Amino acid sequence: MFGALRFIATLQKLYPFWLTTETVKAKQEERFRALLAHAAQNSPYYRRKLAGLDLATCSLSDLPTLTKAEMMENYDDLVTDPRIKKADLSAFTHNLSNLGRLYLGRYGVSHTSGSQGQPALIVQDQDALALIFAVQFARATKLKRRFLPHLGRLINPARMAVMTVKPGFYPSAAAFAYRPKYLAPMFKVLRLSYSDPMETNIRKIENFRPDYITGYASALEALGREEENGRMKLRRLECLKQITNVAEPLSDTAGNWLESIFGAHVTDEYAMGECMVLTSGCIEGRGSHVNADLAILEVVDENNRPVPPGTEGSKVLVTNLYNYVQPIIRYEVDDRVTMSAAPCSCGSPLPHVAKIAGRTKDLLWIEQDGVRREVPYYVFLVPLHNVLDLAEHQIVQTGPRQFVVRLVPIKGKELDIEHIRLLMMKNVREEGLESHVDIEFQVTSAIPLGPSGKVIRVKNEYIQKKATQTEASVPEGAGI
């Protein structure tokens, strides 16, 4: 009970409309200085990197940046608990039965999906894990700020349906697997897999009667189509209050359509495994708000120079202000983000993210029994989760059933292609796609950059070729 009451008190403190821009900046500065001091004292990696800097006065731009490759290469020296070892964590995450079990009896463990290249291992303590839920409920839902409504969750818990890929150590699933036990009375969670039959998921959702649904844009749009076509009847149950999109961009058009279908507000969250509370979805409109008292988001150009609000950056630098176990400072992420130039109309003092373009991918598809079926990116991505010697990858559709998986090993490492092939085909078989796809594996030293100067990790060259052929076959002047 004490843990739940402490959590409710945290919700009150995090309520954004009690804050001002000045108090947010002051709290950010306080936590930033504390993080630097802790990292320099307890992390051999940061002790070297921050040597010679006055950590009480240096500016953010004085600090070195951190890439995923650098973090993974120096992992044992970067973490602040010397008992944490990269090799042990890798073995720990390879055993799915460890999901939800605290590493060293203290830490939650996850690995990033690898959608941004090489997977990264993440450890965080139980306070950080609880903060994920506190921030999202205090800032990304229309819960009232009064104490009693929060206390009422002990009697009438929030009902959350979460649609992810298969169970695993990727961040969204791990967050719920490591949810502190004292939160159990406040949150009833229905976990759904995007790979399960849609009719099964529909029945589970309707029986559960969720207040909130969270999922990838592609999964939410699939649910919307089921509701629109009458195969799901969630709206008439009058239970759904909010839909939250995570991990994939959701267009305004799609968001508005989902709102009209379900009669519930649709919000976006922009986050990553390295900083799960980076933003919270706006409770009134589109986009999300940076939790600037808990994280720093720098939108920069290719030379790490800040770009003004309203201008799309080439990448972002993320500083996590709450994870002292694995300090993540000015961490490079290959996302093209645009911050709002004007304050958000909702009145929040937190900075508003207007647009995220870096994770847009081509759609992959096959024809199955005469019906076109989308093949989600995760079908290829999940088997690559634990390939820690993988630096980069690209999935390319080259024909109606032909796919190429291009793999770049970390410099000085070799990839076990036969092992990767077995993992990939096992996943394809479990998805019921084995007789519908042909997969070729290519190991290469580099993947050509796209027009934006970034790696395009999912390409559908087949549909691009078909579109070009169609255009070429249209007579000149047709349609004018």
Region locations from a protein language model:
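Adenylate-forming
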Residues: 193-200, 210-253, 267-273
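AMP-binding/adenylate-forming catalytic core of the ANL superfamily
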Residues: 213, 317, 322-432
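Conserved AMP-binding/adenylate-forming
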Residues: 245-343
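AMP-binding/adenylate-forming
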Residues: 127-130, 136, 159-221
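Nucleotide 5′-phosphate-binding alpha/beta core
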Residues: 1-111, 118-142, 148-150, 155-157, ...
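Short hydrophobic/charged patches on amphipathic alpha-helices used for structural packing
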Residues: 199-202, 206, 232, 381-384
